[in-house]
């Protein structure tokens, strides 16, 4: 009987030790999760203030603690993606590749949110892979409860623009605007589609709408100027082109517009 009691006592002691270890492990895991989320939130704050270097430092700290968190990987991808666009109008291909790698890593996680699919589709568009971009954006639209369909439809429309399928492109931009009527990208790209389809009056309207919702939208001013010029409305075209130069004086767009303005001199 003493032997039995001793063995039971030993078993209880070992089990108590296991419980204590598990509780300590859970507490440690929760603490790590909290620390990682703190870095993640700080990275988001830096990103919203365009402090990209500090944002990247913080999200890498979060990923050191939790390397498989889809939210952190998406944040890292966005930091790279924001830095793809260079002042002279060219793309930083290294950042573009890093953004794609981070999005692909995020998509390998079971809990990746649908926003990863749409943001990744943007990168695929920049890499001139429209068919893959369409697939990604369509996958996002199939996720129950996805609350930003306008962005997905806009990216699908841009993909069709790149493929030269203007009617399909216009259809998807209109769908985007059904969900979010004040989305400047959808208005601008619908203007491009209408221009290609020869529907210039509608194109002018859409470029004006894009500019109304985002007055600093350089591409929309450029598109407006071009279609106004096609319509023979030279004074209005000149005003649109001058706005391009004012908004982006050192860009390739501005250089091209300056040449066009020479032909508009009275």
Located regions from the model:
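Terminal, low-structured helical/coil segments at or just beyond the last alpha-helical repeat
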Residues: 222, 226-266
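Canonical tetratricopeptide repeat
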Residues: 75-78, 119, 155, 189, ...
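Structural marker of alpha-solenoid helical repeat scaffolds
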Residues: 31, 65, 109-110, 143-145, ...
């Amino acid at each position: 009987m003493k032997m039995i009691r001793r063995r039971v006592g030993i078993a209880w002691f070992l089990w108590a030790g296991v419980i204590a270890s598990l509780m300590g492990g859970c507490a440690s895991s929760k603490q790590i999760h909290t620390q990682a989320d703190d870095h993640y939130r700080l990275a988001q704050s830096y990103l919203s203030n365009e402090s990209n270097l500090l944002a990247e430092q913080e999200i890498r700290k979060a990923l050191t603690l939790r390397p498989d968190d889809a939210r952190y990987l998406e944040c890292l991808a966005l930091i790279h993606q924001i830095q793809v666009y260079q002042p002279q109008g060219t793309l930083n291909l290294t950042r573009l590749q890093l953004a794609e790698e981070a999005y692909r890593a995020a998509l390998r996680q079971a809990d990746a949110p649908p926003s990863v699919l749409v943001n990744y589709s943007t990168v695929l568009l920049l890499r001139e892979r429209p068919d893959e971009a369409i697939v990604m954006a369509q996958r996002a639209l199939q996720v129950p409860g996805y609350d930003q369909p306008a962005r997905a439809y806009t990216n699908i429309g841009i993909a069709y623009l790149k493929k030269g399928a203007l009617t399909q492109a216009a259809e998807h931009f209109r769908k985007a605007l059904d969900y979010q009527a004040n989305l400047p990208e959808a208005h601008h790209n619908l203007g491009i589609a209408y221009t290609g389809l020869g529907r210039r009056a509608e194109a002018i309207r859409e470029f004006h709408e894009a500019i109304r919702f985002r007055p600093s939208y350089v591409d929309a001013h450029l598109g407006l100027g071009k279609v106004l010029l096609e319509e023979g409305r030279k004074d209005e075209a000149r005003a649109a082109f001058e706005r391009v130069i004012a908004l982006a004086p050192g860009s390739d767009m501005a250089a091209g517009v300056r040449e066009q303005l020479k032909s508009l001199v009275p």
